[in-house]
Amino acid sequence: MEQPVLEVQEQPASTAVNAAARPSSSAAPAATAVSPQACASCGAAPAANGGPTTPSSWVYALGNIEARFPSVSVEKEFAQATGREKTAGQNDRQAFHTVLSKPENRYLVRQLCFVMTIEGLETYLLRPRDPADFSLLVEAIRPNPSPLDLDVVIGIKGPVAPPEMCNGLMVPIVVFDQIYSFDRDALIKSIPKPEKTSAKDFAPAAEELFDRIQQMTDNAGAMDEHRALNYLAVRYQAIYSKAAEYFAQNSSLTSVNTQISTLSGMRKILEVVFSYTNRNTDVVDKCFARVDVTDEFPFLVTKLSPYYDR
């Protein structure tokens, strides 16, 4: 299973690569609606039935992936395949993963529905842009799941799935280019601890900030502000170090806001502002980072800095 490695991005760059993830096997299209003369795959996800494309948006979502049977026939076929495998001593989840992991059962993987849930709600139906990426979905179905498991899905949101696609489930289809699968504890442990903060104090501070970002209202990772937040949560360690510093100064995290940067021109750049309020004096300190969300893969433009209200 892939383990996340957060990187220190001291210089703004678009080339930061998660050490746990391999590169996408296909190019990413533009996120805008296309004219009739444009290529068929640019700016739109393919319809589930192979019909016309529809305007779509980028997705950078945090949640959990689960596999479901779209029909009784697929479920029965899976049961027969399970009977051919050596699954003695395994629980149902482990046996499920064993069957899916075998190359000869890849035809079953293609038949399954892979649903992404966010905060317990069914949010997206996942399909790979490249068929080779079905392996990423199999890796996300862990043999020994934990409540702290987390999946990051990066792709493009298309139309709502027809009811016959996944046993009546009608949620937007996301054609993904990359999936990271890890657990929250591994993410926190991969963050270098600030010199003046003990590991005992740092871990709870980082966990609280991460949970606050995850639990923000309606964060399905499809809006630009949520994509920027989710990107920072899993790819930029400085926000956790800064949170630990403020907590050590007896301050509370009171808000996380996003706004369009005045630096936006041809590119769409958002400012993510973190507000901390001192518990004794009620003095508010703010810091922010700029994130470019123009294309499918967000990237850091300005590292974390003090923020002053205009």
Tell where the protein language model's regions lie, with residue ranges.
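N-terminus-biased targeting/localization segments
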Residues: 1-71
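Exposed acidic/polar residues on beta-strands and adjacent loops within beta-sheet cores, strongest
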Residues: 37, 199, 242-245, 254, ...
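Core segments of small alpha/beta cavity-forming domains
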Residues: 40-121, 190-249
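Surface-exposed, charged secondary-structure patches
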Residues: 83, 88-164, 248-310
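Contiguous hydrophobic, core-forming segments of folded domains
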Residues: 138-211
